[in-house]
Design a protein with these regions (language model features):
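Short, acidic/polar
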Residues: 58-70, 140-145, 222-233, 304-307
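C-terminal segment of N-terminal export signals and the immediately downstream linker at the start
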Residues: 23-54
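N-terminal substrate-binding region of glycoside hydrolase catalytic domains
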Residues: 45-100, 112, 117-132, 245
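Conserved, mostly hydrophobic/aromatic
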Residues: 76, 106, 159, 244, ...
């Protein structure tokens, strides 16, 4: 089987490249097996690691994408269609079309499903601002969790009950974010959300999901400390929680380092009896100066390797999900910062390229699974 080192060595040779549909594919990619026992999910299963990805509603209509999804992954999460805003166009009304389609696909292919998410400060319904008050916000939140959680009860491996509740720079007590939920209900919205979720779907793993807590920077250290403190309060108060989701939106070419901080975060969660999931993994390549796709892929793959080698040291890490499958669908291309910094260059942050062919990150992820201890 080809290794990451062999792949990157081959990818760096100009003679290995073929121009296809505006992207560069390497001979190594076409020749090496990637399905069956060579798939990401099979390499993950050997180590007891669930292998997943976020799926957009439009992508799920593509038959080639469907085949790739079923071949490579055993866990899926909806990119947007289970969020409050996309689900609820009017108060009390829900459009289940896209969410149901993903659940049906996953069940057909015997894949697990992550629910994302019940409570978040962003992507709220258009009606929320004018409708929600301090008098009715609790009912809106509880009804929403009951409605969505109840519809998919018993079908969801884990729910991101609360997403991104920490924002130290907001200056609120305990580093909590000054979100609409906080302002309308107060900090008790957190405990209420988890108790409601447990009541609604007792078998789902209840997760707290957060970003910007992974690297060794001072800002990440502050947010990491606030996150671990929140989890400790949950445990002390009897708030039902089973897992920490580390989003893992990280960067290549920027000098970010991962080591002490990641180990501190994962061990802190593990000591509280929590499982750990890497929930939204991708590697932003805007910081890589060279425009050559081979150079960028090598840089991105190196970050995947370094990050996963550290994270997967711990048997507490039970799942690795990338935020998307192929470069053609990544959300990073829509970011304002990307459009301003690299207006003529599309991101290559994921394990498959625009043509659904494996990139260097594919082999980096697969090799990282092989090196991880069995859990």
């Amino acid at each position: 089987m080809i290794t990451r080192r062999d792949y990157l060595k081959q990818a760096s040779l100009a003679g290995c490249c073929l121009a296809v549909s505006g992207t560069r594919l390497f001979a190594a990619e076409a020749e090496q097996p990637i399905t069956g026992k060579a798939s990401l999910k099979e390499h993950g299963r050997k180590r007891g690691i669930m292998t997943g990805c976020a799926v957009g509603a439009r992508a799920l209509h593509d038959e080639a994408f469907q085949r790739l999804l079923a071949e490579q992954y055993d866990l899926v999460v909806s990119e947007n269609s289970m969020k409050f805003g996309p689900l609820s166009p009017k108060p009390g009304e829900y459009n289940w079309t896209d969410a149901d389609a993903l659940v049906d696909f996953a069940e057909k292919h015997k894949m697990k499903i992550r629910g994302h998410n019940f409570v978040w400060h962003a992507q709220l319904p258009v009606w929320f601002k004018e409708t929600a008050t301090k008098d009715n916000a609790k009912k809106i939140m509880v009804d929403h969790i009951h409605t969505v959680g109840g519809r998919y009860k018993g079908k969801i491996q884990a729910w991101d009950v609360v997403n991104e509740a920490i924002q130290v720079s907001d200056g609120m007590p305990d580093g909590l974010r000054k979100s609409p939920w906080y302002e309308l209900i107060g900090p008790e919205y957190l405990d209420l959300a988890y108790r409601t979720a447990r009541e609604t779907d007792p078998k789902a793993k209840l997760t707290y999901n957060e970003y910007g807590i992974e690297d060794d920077s001072e800002d990440n250290a502050k947010k990491r400390a606030a996150t671990l403190a929140l989890l400790k309060r949950f445990k002390a108060n009897g708030t039902p929680i089973d897992a920490l989701g580390i989003q893992s939106h990280i960067h290549a070419g920027t000098g970010e380092t991962y080591g002490r901080g990641m180990r501190e975060l994962i061990s802190g969660a593990h000591e509280l009896g929590l499982e750990v999931y890497l929930t939204e993994f991708d590697v932003n390549d805007d910081g890589v100066q060279d425009d050559d796709p081979a150079v960028r892929d090598k840089a991105v793959a190196a970050v995947y390797t370094d990050y996963l080698d550290i994270a997967l040291e711990s048997k507490a890490v039970k799942a690795v999900l990338t935020w998307g499958v192929s470069d053609r669908d990544t959300w990073l291309n829509g970011l304002k910062e990307h459009r301003e910094k690299r207006p003529n260059r599309r991101q290559r942050p994921l394990p498959f390229d625009n043509d659904l062919k494996p990139t260097a990150p594919f082999f980096a992820i697969r090799d990282a699974f092989d090196k991880a201890p069995k859990r």
